[in-house]
Structures are given as C-alpha cells and as structure tokens.
Curated annotation (Swiss-Prot):
Annotated localization: Cytoplasm; Nucleus
Keyword Nucleus carried by entry: yes
Gene Ontology cellular-component annotations: cytoplasm; nucleus; proteasome core complex, alpha-subunit complex
UniProt keyword terms in alphabetical order: Cytoplasm, Nucleus, Proteasome
Signal peptide: none
Protein name: Proteasome subunit alpha type-1
Main location: cytoplasm
Provenance organism: Caenorhabditis elegans
Subunit field text: The 26S proteasome consists of a 20S proteasome core and two 19S regulatory subunits. The 20S proteasome core is composed of 28 subunits that are arranged in four stacked rings, resulting in a barrel-shaped structure. The two end rings are each formed by seven alpha subunits, and the two central rings are each formed by seven beta subunits. The catalytic chamber with the active sites is on the inside of the barrel.
C-alpha cells in the first residue's frame, strides 16, 4: 500500500468507497503472529504463536483471561491488543457489579463492536491495529468470536487471524465436522495442528512460543502451563507435517479430514 490523498484521516472516503486508514489497520492485524480459535459443544479453545524480538528477549504475551468464563487472543499491534483486553476486563467487571452474574458472550461482542466502530468513524482517531478472538462459555454454550479493525464481529465455529492464517483456516475447513463432538484434548490438538500450518517448514511449535487457553462447561477459563503445553505438543508431533504447510493430515481421534 502507498500513501495517497484519501488516507490522511479515517473519515475520508476514496472514490472507490474505501477507508484506507481502516485497510491499513487490517494489514497490521495480518502481520501479527497467528492465533487460532475453535469450539465444540462444550468447550472453546484459543491457541497463539508468541514471538520473541531476539534471542535475549522473552516471548510476548498473546492470550489474556478477561473473566472466569472468557479469554482473548490477539494478532497485530500488541499494545493495542492489551488496551482492548483491559477494556473487555472492565466490561466484565462492570456487568458482574450491576447484574451479579457473568456477562453473556454476545453482549461482550456487542460492546467490542461499538468500541472498534467508534475509531473508524470519528475525526482524529485511528483504528485499532489488532484482531481479537474471544473464547467463552455461557448459558448458550461455547463461543468463538472474531473481531477485526473494521469493527466486523463474527461468531465462528473455527477461525484464524494473523500472518499466514489462511493455511490454518484451510485445516479448519477440512476438519470442521469433527469439532462439535471433540473432547477438550482433541480440540486442543486440532487447534495446534492448524497453528502449526502457519509456520515455515523449518520452524516448529514448542512450549515457549505457544500459548493455549481453554474454557468450557463447568471449567473456568485457564491458561495452560508450559508443562501442559508440552504434553499436547507431543501429541501433535505424532501427526506428520504436510509439504508446504497444506492442511491434509489425518484428524485427531482417527477421523479423516473433510474435503472442501
């Protein structure tokens, strides 16, 4: 993308009906390290690839708990992601104070949509350069909600955002019929296999660069410790990687991938 006379502010439309500032923010999301979210009847899982700036730095946090029944993963500008995660935490706390119960995930998604949309409409603001996946469980079941800087908020069975996320979505599309009845362990393996497909052939997942969050029926949101992550990665290692990152490996639990 190159600078032009229509990208000076978020309120300026191009003759083609585009908001270039919003498109630039979406590109920032696409440059972030990938994250994957999928759900079954009873659980929702988010996994994320953490990056380290160099060999001397720690890996950046990508998954946050926002309430006992929900968590988020982010792709894009991490500083923007932290602001939005804190906003969602505040929304959850306010709802609990007012109504003495956990906020419904759909209400949380609506609040996020309004927050994102305001920065695409008013002069002097810039869109958030981050995409967020919300994983939650409430009386309506498990939820995966995808958001992006354009304020598009969508409920998904499975999705991925960030760099090379199309490879992960290909895996998810081929295995979507297996998710609904999956156990929590199988769901995590599905998510990790999809995340692995976003990596170049010479790289692999490990306990240091992988975050896993899970929430479900009678199970509060939790971030897995490195030792627990390593156990699931050992299961993933039994599934061979396909050439070029294409998602065609056999599904966990013995099921064959769905052909699209």
């Amino acid at each position: 993308m190159f600078r032009n006379q229509y990208d000076g502010d978020v309120t300026v439309w191009s003759p083609q009906g585009r908001l270039h500032q919003v498109e630039y923010a979406v590109e920032a999301m696409k440059q972030g390290s990938a994250t994957v979210g999928i759900k079954s009847e009873t659980h929702a899982v988010i996994v994320a690839l953490k990056r380290a700036q160099n060999d001397l730095s720690s890996h950046q946090k990508k998954v946050y708990e926002i309430d006992t029944h929900a968590g988020v993963s982010i792709a894009g500008l991490l500083s923007d992601g932290r602001i939005l995660a804190r906003y969602l935490q505040t929304e959850c706390s306010s709802w609990r104070w007012d109504y003495k119960q956990a906020v419904p995930i759909k209400k949380l998604a609506e609040s996020m949509q309004l927050k994102l949309q305001a920065n695409t409409q008013y002069y002097g603001r810039r869109p958030f350069g981050v995409g967020i996946l919300i994983a939650g469980y409430d009386k309506d079941g498990a939820h995966i909600i995808q958001t992006d800087p354009s304020a598009e908020v969508v409920s998904m069975h499975g999705t991925s955002i960030g760099a090379r996320s199309q490879s992960a979505r290909t895996y998810l599309e081929r295995n979507v019929d297996n998710f609904e009845k999956s156990t929590p362990e199988q769901l995590i393996v599905h998510a990790l296999l999809a995340l692995r497909d976003t990596l170049p052939a010479e790289e692999n997942l490990n306990a240091q660069n992988t975050s896993i969050g899970i929430v479900g029926k009678d199970s509060p949101f939790s971030l897995l410790e490195d030792a627990q992550v390593a156990v699931h990665l050992n299961q993933v290692s039994t599934h061979p990687r396909t050439t070029g990152g294409a998602a065609a490996a056999a599904a966990p639990g013995g099921a064959e991938p769905m052909q699209m």
